[in-house]
Design a protein with these regions (language model features):
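N-terminal signal-anchor/signal peptide hydrophobic helix marking the start
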Residues: 245-254
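Polar-ligand-bearing catalytic/cofactor-coordination segments
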Residues: 1-244, 258, 262-338
Length: 338
């Protein structure tokens, strides 16, 4: 519910900014592109302020239920730094788009999409190097398991790194990150400390599955499919304000992008769930441990206090992973077939 309220707050804040934000351009002497970038950052600032109370409420709930041990001040600083990263990304995106619009007033969207994809690929490439508190695997048995699993999935030598998250607490996590030579698996230290070896193997095999099946590249391809129609709609909607050649169109453009991404949420979550299901299946095929897989998902569900079988609307709008029951049923189906 908090996530839904935060989304409503975001849409309301951006809707008001789209209606009134153009007037801020009159106060700027930063030039056409500079003013557009400032308006973009201002819009994200309004969104951050609107969502901040809901983030605090979510943290309070997690602390109250023992999911997180992070302090409020630490969380606020982290959230502010995360917002800074978003400011950087939106500024770079507006710099690219408005520069292209200066050359092709109404065809900018055709050239902007590949340029934005290149930026997204660059961010994906460097992201593993920007994560804090990272170190190599120190457990020789886990390291040996990781090497064996990576080789079994056709990606030998793929590194595994550990992220210290002792200040965050909560349910353990892991992720596949990077592109090409930067790709790797990141596991939280809480996973290694609190889960048995068989379940750690399942997690590692799942994350290696994302890499061996090129899910990050597929994610970029999916982004391209979304960006092209979104950019075209932005061009059509902002045309009365001069298109993205004019900085006064930036507040409306941001609102349109967020609304379109919201409307595409069911497609995005379905795509993500499909990739996660494939990684689950790869893990089962690699580890041959359906019992450990079922135990893993049950334990993660208890730690994170998530619904094993959430309502359909929640699944469509909020769930980018299969439900716990769906993942357990897959493990049972694998066992029945083998």
């Amino acid at each position: 519910m908090v996530a839904v309220l935060a989304l409503v707050a975001q849409l309301v804040a951006l809707g008001l900014y789209a209606a009134k934000g153009a007037r801020f351009a009159r106060e700027s002497a930063a030039g056409r592109i500079g003013t557009g970038m400032l308006l973009g950052m201002l819009g994200l600032g309004f969104v951050w302020l609107a969502q901040f109370p809901f983030g605090l409420a979510a943290l309070w709930w997690e602390r109250d239920h023992g999911i997180s041990h992070q302090g409020y001040l630490t969380w606020a600083i982290d959230d502010f730094l995360l917002a800074g990263g978003r400011f950087l990304f939106i500024s770079l995106a507006l710099l690219i788009v408005m520069a292209i619009a200066g050359v092709w007033r109404r065809r900018w969207w055709l050239a902007a999409v590949p340029a934005l994809l290149a930026v997204s690929a660059l961010f994906a490439f460097v992201q593993p190097y920007l994560l804090p508190n990272i170190h190599a695997l120190r457990d020789p048995q886990v390291a040996a398991d990781a090497r064996q699993l990576a080789a079994a999935e056709g990606i030998p030598g793929t590194p595994v790194r550990v992220q210290n998250t002792r200040n965050l607490g909560g349910a353990p996590n892991a992720e596949a990150a990077g592109l090409g030579p930067s790709r790797r698996v990141i596991v939280w230290d809480t996973l290694l400390k609190r889960f048995p070896p068989a379940q750690i193997r399942v997690v590692l095999a799942h994350e290696f599955g994302h890499l061996s099946r090129d899910h990050l590249w597929k994610g970029l391809a999916w982004t391209a499919l979304l960006l092209l129609p979104i950019a075209l709609v932005v061009e059509l909607v902002t045309r009365r304000r001069g298109g993205l050649y004019e900085p006064t169109a930036v507040p409306l453009a941001i609102f349109v992008v967020v609304v379109l991404l919201f409307l595409a949420t069911p497609l995005q979550t379905a795509f993500s769930r499909r990739l996660e299901s494939e990684a689950d299946w790869v893990a089962l095929q690699t580890t041959h441990e359906p019992g450990a897989t079922q135990a893993l998902f049950r334990r993660l569900s208890r730690l994170a206090l998530v619904q094993p079988d959430p309502p359909r609307w929640t699944k469509l709008l909020l769930e980018d992973h299969p439900s716990v029951m769906e993942r357990i049923e897959m493990a049972r189906a694998w066992r029945a077939r083998h």
